[in-house]
Each structure stands twice: as C-alpha cells, then as structure tokens.
C-alpha cells in the first residue's frame, strides 16, 4: 500500500516565494491587496453557495498507477488541486470523468477502460460523493444529503455502478439512474468547458486556426449537438421523402390489385346476401330455441312464487286452528272442572237430603204420636163425659174411619209407584234409543265432513288442472304460427328481454333455452317418449355461469309474472359436444335419445347429456319388445333405461307406466293436441260440475244431520230431566210410612178405665199439648228438606246442562284438532311440492341459462323471434343448398372475400401511411424552420455573451482584445494586445508569447463558463506554458475573481504550480497532493504530462 496523500490548505506563513518571482510579487502586491479587500466584503454564508450537484469528495483505488488516492474533500466554491507531476492530479480528473459515466476516449488517456486498472490488480474502484443539499435536491427522502457513486472496473474492461445513499445503502445499480441524476444536475461530462482535460487544453492551446476555436465554442455551448440534430433530421427527412415517393409508386399497384379484387367481390353480392340472411336465420334460430325454454320456465317460476306466498296462508290457518284447539281445550277443561264441582255438590246434597229425610220422618212420627196422644186424651175425656152408648158408637165410627182411610191411601200410593216405574222404564229405553241416534248422527256428520274435504281437494286439483290446460291451450293455439308459444305465452317476451340484455353486455354468454325449442325429432312418433324422458328439461334454460343465472332470474321475474317459471341449469359452455363414445349405449336396432334428436347447438346437447344422460337411454316403440330387451338375460351395455312409444319407462328390474298420454311441446301435430286438450277440458269441467253437485248435496246432508243431532240432544236432556223427577218422586213415595191403626181393644180398655183415669188424663192432656207444640216447631225442617230437594233437582239440571256443554266442547276440540291436522297435512304437502318445484325451477333456470349462453355464442344480442324453430330450420337448409349451388359456379367465396379484404386493407393502410408521412414532413418543415430561427438567435446571443465576458477578463489584466465570430464559415478569430488599446494595435494570438497565449486561452475558456450551465467546472493544468507574471494574474483571475463572480458554482483547478500567491479566503480550498514515491517509473511520471 502506498502512503496516503496529505490534504491541506495553503498557509501563507509557511510559503516561500521563489527568487525569480520577488520582483513580480512586489509589483503586484498592491493589486493583490485590493483584490482581497474586494473579496472580503462579498464573502457570503455557506447557505448562499449552491450545494446541489457539486463534488464533495473522491476516492481512487487501484486506478491507473495509484494503489490508493484519497479521499479528497472539496470546497463548495474554488478548489485548487496542487501537486507535482506523477502525484495523481490527472488521475483524479480521469477518475471523475469515468465515475460520471464518461468513456475512455473522453479522458484522452486511453482507448479502453481496462487500461485504467493498475498493473497486477484485478479491478479498480472510483468513488465520488455528490452534495444533495437544498431545495433542488434529487430525491432527498431516498438518498439523503449526499449521493455516493461507486464504479468498479474489471481487468476485462467491464464496469458496474452502485448508487448509494448518504447512509451507505445501495439504491440502484443501473447506469440509467446515473444518467438521470446527471441530467437532473445538468452535469455534462463530455463538455470541455465543464471538464477541460490536459490533452484538450494542449490541443486548444496549440490550435492556430479559427475553425478549431469555433468548434470548441460550439461544443462548449452544446450548439454543435443542436446542429448535428438538425443535420440528422434533414437527412432523415430526405430518406423519408424518398420512401414516400417509393410508396406512392407501390400504392398505384395496390390500387390496381384492389380494384380487380373488388370486381370479383361485387360479383358475390347475391351470395353475400344469402350468407347474411343465413347468419341472421341462425341467430334467430338460436334465440327461438331460447324462447321455447323461457316459455317453459316462466310458468314454473310463477307457480313457485305463488306457492311461496300461499305458504303464509297455510301457516296462518294452522296457527289459527292451533289457537282454536287451545281455546276449546281450555273450555273443555273448565267444563270438566265445573262438572266435577257439580257432581261433588250433588253428592253432598244427596247425603244431606237423605239425612234430612230420615230426620223429618222421625220427627213427623214423633209429632203424630204426640197429636194422637192429645186427641186420645181429649177423646177419652169427652168419651168419659158421655155415656157409654155414645162412646161405643164413637169407637165404632173411629175404627171404621181408620180402616177406610188407611186402605185408600195405600192403594193410591201403590198405583202411583207402579205408574212411575213403568214411566221410568219407558224413559230409560227412550234415552238409550236417543243416545244411539246421537252417536249415529255424529258419525254421519264426521263422515260427511271428511267426504266434503276430500271432494273440495279433488275439485281444487281439477280446477288447477283446468287452468293449466287452459293456459296450455292458449299457448298451443298461439303456437300455430309460432312454436315458441307452446312453452308459454310470455316466452317470446322473455327471449326478447334476454336479447336486449345481451346487447347491453349484461350476459357473459347468451343463455340457451327453452331446450325443447332448440331440438328437433328425427322420428315424430317418439315425441311423447322423448318428452317424458326429458321431463322439465324441455322447458329449462341453461347458463354458462352464476352471474348470467342471476341476470336471467331477474329477467324472468320481470317478464314471467304468472305461472311456473322454467328451471335454470348453470353449467360451463363448451364449443364442442362431449365425447360419449365410451359410455354411450349403441344398439343395432334401436336408437338412443341422443341419436333420435337433431341438435345443432353443442351447448344444448351437452346440457341434455349432463342432466339426463340421453346417450344411455334407448327408445323402443313396442312396450313388450322393450321389456324383452331390458329385462332379458343380457341387457344392452351402458343402457340405464328404455322408453316405449307410449312413454312407459322400463328398467332391468322394474317398469313404470306413464300418466301423460300425448306430447305437449315436441309434437308436430298442433291441431290434434288442441282437440285433445279441449276434450280433456270438457271432461274435467263435467267432473268438476259433478263434484260441485256432490258437495252441495253433502252440505245439505251435513245441515240436516246437525239439526237432527241438535233436536235429539235436546230431547235427550228433557227425557233425563223427566227421569230424574220421577226417580225423586218414586223415592219419596217409597219412603212414606203407612199410619198404624189403633188397637181397639186398648181403646175399649181405656174407655172402661176412662172414668178412673179422668184426672190423670186431664194432666196428661196438658203435658201432651205442650209436647205437641214442641214437635210442631221441630217439624218445620220439612220446608228445608223441600228446599234441599229443589236444590238437588236444580243442581242435577245444571249437571245435565254441563254434560251437554262438555259434549259440545268435546266435539269442538275434536273438530278443531281435525282441522288442525287437516291444514298441517296440507301445509306439509304444500312445502314438499314447493321443494320439488324449487328443484324443478332451478333445473329449468339452469337449462334456460345454458340455452341463452349458447344463443349468445351465436348472436350476442338478443333477438325477438316470432317464427318457429322448425320453419327457421327448413329455411336454413334451403339457403345452404342454394349457397352450395352458387359456390360451385363462382368458386370459393371465402377465398374471394379474404383476398378482397386483404387488398382493401393493404391499400388503405398504405394510403394512410403515405398521408401520415406527408403530414409529418409538412409539420417537420414548419418545426425545423422555427427551431432553426431559434437556433440562430441563441447562437447570436451566446456569441455576444462570450465576447462580453472575454473582453472583461482581458481588461482585468490590462489586455485588450477582439473576438470575431464568422458563423457562415464557422470560424472564430481572437486578437489580443498585451498593452492598452490606444497604445498598440491588436495582434493575433499566434504573435503572442506562450504565457500570454496560455493566459488568453484561459480567459477564453473562463468566458464560456457563464454561458454553460453546470454545478461544477474543472480545468487541468490551466497555467501551463505561462510565465510567473501571467500565472499570478491567472491565479488571481481564476481564484479571487471566480470566487467572487462564480460563487454559486464549484470550480476545480489542477496545477503543478504553487498557489502561494493566493490570499487566504474561505471560498478558496487548496488540495495539496503528496509528492510521488521515489523510484516511480517513467510511465507513472508521464501520466501527468509536462
């Protein structure tokens, strides 16, 4: 490693003037002091000095003959790099040029970059730091306040760049980014005024002709580049004019060829019209098939919407009857509770009644005993007072009266009991008969209600079938002129809406449908079996994607507002039919469904293959033959099922009979279908009228049963009340005690002893009278017993009424539960039908989307087609035959059309190119005139500025001079007179001494600086060949004066001379290089020049 070069500013205390310079120093001392005085007041703060784009430092490693130079720091204004020959001054300048992107020729130091790598080393590195401070900084948020440019040069001459930020992070490695930074800072590496190398300085110094000076001026001001651009543009313009002339000749041949092709093309006008019509028919055919699928889809969708709306009604009905059941059960529970309470009251009252009855009978017996005793004693007393005859007669009369009274009362009571028992037996039998009648009436009522509901449901189904047949009849009648009407009255409107949406770009692929409209049968007899096989797919649409499906659903919602909407099948569209040769059934005698259909659209065929596997289903007209084929020992391979001409589906182990009797969509005989539908509708109307008559008869029977049931229940209640009254009366009669007859013997004995016991009886009468009064009071319980009996009767009646109410509530609960179950079953069946319908609608919608997508592939814009697909198919076939006949006579139409369009396009393109080139040439002439004028004005302006600055700099030295520009001959002559202008005439620079000529050259170069924009200037050995006097003047000129006048730019001067004559100043920075190492080779010394 070589010793690092020292960097220091010049200290005037250590400077020693050479002896030969003492005289010049003394003569110029006053001038130098004045310069210092002028400079000192004008020293500005560092913030006023431009810091953007100036060189902050440079470092060289293994560059040229130096192992390590630097880092060298530079000031922001005037910099002198001072050093002896071989110290590395020119290496610094060369490294600056190379690091900023200059090539080897720009350095005048070699022909290749690999020559700059030090001998024995594999690469060289040059690193330059540019200041990036100020409002004009380049991307300060990325690079910071400095931009570091590292360039690595390999031994092979390959160089790489690294642009780093202030912190050392690598920002870019592209030369384009370096060029962008240089353009941003306006750093012109190849401009000799920006960087004047030693060789260029020597060449300019020794040049004696005015052409070289003029060329230097042009290159320094970049006018030479502008001139070269003008020359290049003019030459390019001449080439362009020549090419335009050549193209014009070629254009004539192209026009001739185009006219020939046009004549042949016009002869195909009739064929073109047929082709146009054929394409239009194909488009109509595609959308006609879509319309048929839409007609099938819309009724399904409408039916689904209406069924969904009806679901709420079913829910409301179920909830309503649930609430009624709860209310009825509440009433039933309340009636049960009340009945239990009444039963308990009856039980309590009956027990009380029995107790009261027993007590009353006992007290009545006591009362009668007391009264008998009183009367007996009174009679005894009266009898005692009468004579015996009268007493005997009285006893006889009394005995006879008792005998007669007792027998009549008992006989009457027994007869009444027999009557009551007979009446009770009749009432019991009658009550049983009424109960059986009530049960019979209730059973008839329930049976009639169930039959009525069944007939109403049957009538509702018939009415729906009639409405569907009526819509289908309307569609079929409309389909006489338009087959699409079979799929629904609103199907043409739906297809029109699909066409309109497709024109607006709402569909990615036009949906296809109805699928049944897009297929045709090879054998019309198979229409019923194929239609039953395809089921809802006949009316379905198919779409390519779910976005198209949503658009199609919205269109169906708007257009198909009634009836069921077709299903939509969403499946990706393919331009070719699926290859089903491996899995398809192939029978020698019977076709598959796929083979029996004519399908032009591959999307429709693929949809039917994917959804129904029509390649695996056979069509066998004879039902018996179909069973033999399918249910034999060897059924056909890949065959899943077979259909007979009647629509029966036969599997290998079972078969199903079809309910449908005729084809509704695929049949060609529309009139027969219309007649069949009318007959079917008449039959359904007769059935509906018969069912309505039955419903009315059932309503009448229900009403009569209700009246009979009500009357019978009322009669039963009345009979029960009568039975209860008779039972109470019978109980009372059976409980009556017969009065006991008095013993006449005792009476006679008492009579005989009457006299003896007269006194005793007198006392006994008083005692018995008192006791009888007491018994009378006690017998007053009898009204209470009667009241209690009435209460029992009333409670019993209430019990009967509650039983009747309970029976009503039981019937009401049963009725509500029956209705709840009925509506629950209807709702479940309705939900199942909705789910099935949703699946069908989804399938049909998918089919519709696929149909629309397939139609959009043929015609992106939806068309309103009023013709049937069958008629369109016939016309397409006819046109194809006619076109084939025309092509045989005229040749290949496509080839003729292709050649015509190619000739037309070639001719039009060439004509447009020539027109554009002519317009460009005219515009170029106009712009060139404007630019040439601006170039002349700029050249005159820059020449004037250069003269001014040159005269000013010569005057500072006391020289006079003249600078003459001859722009016409491209020469520049400079005349300089060392003395005053009034003392001597101007001389050519060739007459000057070497020092004066070198000084004048420096003045010329410095005069170009103000008119050349760049953040820094660099001169290599600017004072070469100067004597000491001119060198000191040049130093002051370049140092002090430049520090004053060029304070916004960075100036770098390279010189081997001492800068001791310069005063110390903050704007002047001197970099002192170390002396070269002793023993350095001659080649190392020669790198610095003389």
Swiss-Prot record:
One of its GO terms (cellular component) is chromosome, telomeric region. InterPro entries: P-loop_NTPase, RecF/RecN/SMC_N. Residues 8-20 have a biased composition (Basic and acidic residues). Residues 1-44 are annotated as: Disordered. Gene3D superfamilies: 1.10.287.1490, P-loop containing nucleotide triphosphate hydrolases (3.40.50.300). One of its GO terms (molecular function) is damaged DNA binding. Pfam families: SMC_N. This is Structural maintenance of chromosomes protein 6. It comes from Takifugu rubripes (Japanese pufferfish). The gene is smc6.
